[in-house]
Amino acid sequence: MTTVVREAFENHVKLVESRNSPGHVLASSEASFFVADLNDVVRKWAAWKEALPDVTPFFAVKSSYDRRLIQTLATCGAGFDCASTEEIELILSLGIGAERIIFTHPCKPVSSLGLCRKLGITLITFDNECELRKLHHHYPEAQTVLRVFADDPTNADPLGTKFGAARDDFDGLVRLVKELNMQLAGASFHAAPSVAVDAAAYVRGIRDTAEVFARARQVGLNPTVLDIGGGYTDSTFQQIAGAVRPAIAECFKSEVGEGRLRILAEPGTLFSCSPFYLAVKVVARRVNATAFGHEPATRLYINDGIYSNFMMRFIVNMTFSPAAVIREGVWHDQADHTMRGEACSLWGRSCDSNDCINRDCRLGPEVRVGDWLVFKDMGAYTTVCNTTFNGFTSSNHTIYLEPGTHPSRRSPVDL
């Protein structure tokens, strides 16, 4: 974590707490807030283009609706993977052209097809006969992309059970595209983020999409778009990229050689996760909670939870551990306290007994009511998953650290 990120947190905590007085604590001073280092987005983009120079990232908008993040990626040259009309409208509202959008949801309402046709969004994904016939009826000139089944058995949240055409269906779907006199722009797959690196899932997906291309050419179609999907994380990207490059060169040798292959990908978490840090406030502390089993005796209750920015704890059982404690505007890094700090559990703000962020962690110094806990890697599937359960709202404040200047001189933009 850079010094400028830490200073942004410390300065904001000092600011909001300075507005309070004895007996009068402003609600705004207790709201969780983010710090977003947009320079990290630019670094990620550069790393992507170095590892996969011929692959254009189409950012998976579902992972984050943050407008400043999206604008930064647009400036870098990204396209955008949208799965709903609302996501499409978000991208267009930022002045980004429709030609930079791919509509990737394989099963769509008719109204969304009408919107795409009106706006000129041409790349549309499908994975079954019914969807293709719906496209033919409502948007016959669409540039269709056949999504094939591709999954990794180690995935925490596998998508293959929901979307993707099986190999046995390739031939029939390709022939139906030809019969309906439609265009097959290409093929795609999606291997969701996995708990272990299985680059073989991407290689399988590339081989299957190459088979779609081959069958399409046999019936007189001319696909040119290969979409290698998403699922990339900081810990897996380089290994996946190392497997993807030779697989594309092998399976699409003629297309690559003739310069007629357009390659896309749909990274979301890779770009949206690490730039964002979240600070939550400790609103209550309970000690001697020994009657609840083997958990630590101290419970800390925070002003956030699984129905707000920690939904991934509920969806994929992700563990969240604070990177720092801020007390009276002073930062206390937690790297040295993982083994010798105070044992405690962290609980969310709702009345749901499942709203537990971490059942056993160690923090130091001893955390008090009013302290702040800072979590890193909080940009993906956080604000987009917020609910109003128990009446709690999540109008989170974000402090943006702008890219393009030296970190030591970069000024935070407070919005």
Curated annotation (Swiss-Prot):
- GO annotation, cellular component aspect: cytoplasm
Q: What induces it?
A: Expression is induced in loline alkaloid-producing cultures as well as in planta.
Q: Which GO terms describe its molecular function?
A: ornithine decarboxylase activity
Site residues, Stacks against the aromatic ring of pyridoxal phosphate and stabilizes reaction intermediates: H190
Where, by residue number, does substrate bind? I315, V316, D352
List the Gene3D superfamilies hit by this protein, alphabetically. Answer: Alanine racemase, Lyase, Ornithine Decarboxylase, Chain A, domain 1
Q: Which UniProt keywords apply?
A: Alkaloid metabolism, Decarboxylase, Lyase, Pyridoxal phosphate, S-nitrosylation
Known SUPFAM superfamilies for this protein?
Answer: Alanine racemase C-terminal domain-like, PLP-binding barrel
Write down the required cofactor(s).
pyridoxal 5'-phosphate
Q: Which residues carry this modification: S-nitrosocysteine?
A: C351
Q: Where does pyridoxal 5'-phosphate bind?
A: S194, G231, E266, P267, G268, T269, Y381
Active-site residues annotated for this sequence: C351
Return the protein name. Answer: Amino acid decarboxylase lolD2
Recorded name of the encoding gene: lolD2
